[in-house]
Amino acid sequence: MEERFCRTAMLIGEAGLVRLKAARVAVFGIGGVGSFAAEALARAGVGRLVLIDNDAVAASNLNRQLVALYSTLGRSKAAVMKARIEDINPAAEVEIVEDFFLPERAGLFFRGHYDYIVDAIDTVAGKIGLVMEAKKRTIPIVSSMGAGNKLDPTKFEVADIYETSVCPLARVMRRELKSRGVEALKVVYSKEKPRKPLFALREESAEKGGQAFSKQPPGSISFVPSVAGLILASVVVRELAGLTLE
């Protein structure tokens, strides 16, 4: 047994470690939620990871994203995350796709089989498209709902999308998925009522087909999206390792 995973084996067993090492997991979105999900998956022993994000590290990411350091400003988030994971587990196979997910170009993002997909995309259209693609290909997926404008990480829960409440993003997702005939989707969502930002802020984004546009971002803090990402990873690890919570 590899020393770096011996403590993990005490919880999930050697058979669980073997399953994780053989698994190929895709993380869509390497931001405040996705960066923590990706690193937790790597530290748990997932052997093959595909990281999808077309964004570069910005100063506004420093308050919450694992990839954000002064030394990484301006660099590709996916590339920074890949280097970080390889420094944690040099044996891991890490691929990156530095592009924005669009359903009409799904083939670029689904090269080879995925055992699980983590949806940490922060646009409704992207999330809907990814869920539909995963369902079409019968790939397990867990999706993050809204983590912005919140201060209480203890309010996160894992539930089916149709059992969610409070979260505005989950409300939109319920409506859109129902209209498309999707019967179930595992999500991580918060029951905390979103706070109204104390002031408005505009920032450039590259999330519309790779073209920059101005948007109003939500308020964020270090200890909320990170927890959502860790919960996403926990769902994936338990299911891939064949574990259940008592």
Regions found by a protein language model. Give the residues of each.
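Glycine-rich phosphate-binding loop and adjoining beta1-alpha1-beta2 segment
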Residues: 46, 51-89
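Conserved N-terminal Rossmann-fold NAD(P)-binding element of oxidoreductases
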Residues: 27-29, 52
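Conserved SAM/SAH-binding loop
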Residues: 98-106
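N-terminal charged helix/coil linker that caps or initiates catalytic domains
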Residues: 1-26
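Glycine-rich phosphate/adenylate-binding loop
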Residues: 2, 112-113, 126, 136, ...
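Short, well-ordered coil/turn residues at beta-beta hairpins
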Residues: 120-121, 144
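Hydrophobic/small residue at the entry helix of a nucleotide-binding pocket
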Residues: 33
